């Protein structure tokens, strides 16, 4: 990677998240917008990426071919869909490009492909790039170690009507943080749905509830409930810019790293706390 400005490429440049990633890349010192990508056949191809994002002319035009811009970026930022991200991952691995992956909804094979690629390239892969969410994950680990053995743990998340996966990647990351703190595997203790006659709550499980409505950017709550008291730890996002800023900050953090799989807690040095 270059020692000067880190040049980033943005996938899905015409989407809501893509436009905010462009804004964030143009705003952060030490980062340069090198390329912007959209799918083949998009009406946005050839548009100026900065103008598309409402940030003024940049001279970077929206392209559909990664091969055409492979010399224009060092780190690829991807918040698209799993199938597209895995195609981009293969390209970046072949060409030695770092990646910041905010795509959610991967199956186990997809996650393994990311782990495998990290042997050759540096990747930041996180369910949520918000600073606040990642601080929350650390707090959940602490709370689980103190209260997790005797409380009922529930995770409630809410997002906009257009979100296609559930539970959210962030909700799953919350569950994994709690389960790990309790020396459990989330797949063995998660309860993702309840309906009809469920019987009493099974001790030691982690419940999930999902809301999809309106334009909710993202709300997540973890509840540790006992008889007589409960602790709730909540994060509410009011703008996608918090995710975009964190992702671009992660791209800058990758400077000088040749390989390895990292998450936002590494970027923020939360693992040392």
Curated annotation (Swiss-Prot):
This is 4-hydroxy-tetrahydrodipicolinate reductase. One of its GO terms (cellular component) is cytosol. The active site is at 159 (proton donor/acceptor), 163 (proton donor). Keywords: Amino-acid biosynthesis, Cytoplasm, Diaminopimelate biosynthesis, Lysine biosynthesis, NAD, NADP, Oxidoreductase. Homotetramer. It comes from Shigella boydii serotype 4 (strain Sb227). NADP(+) binds at residue 39. Pathway: Amino-acid biosynthesis; L-lysine biosynthesis via DAP pathway; (S)-tetrahydrodipicolinate from L-aspartate: step 4/4.
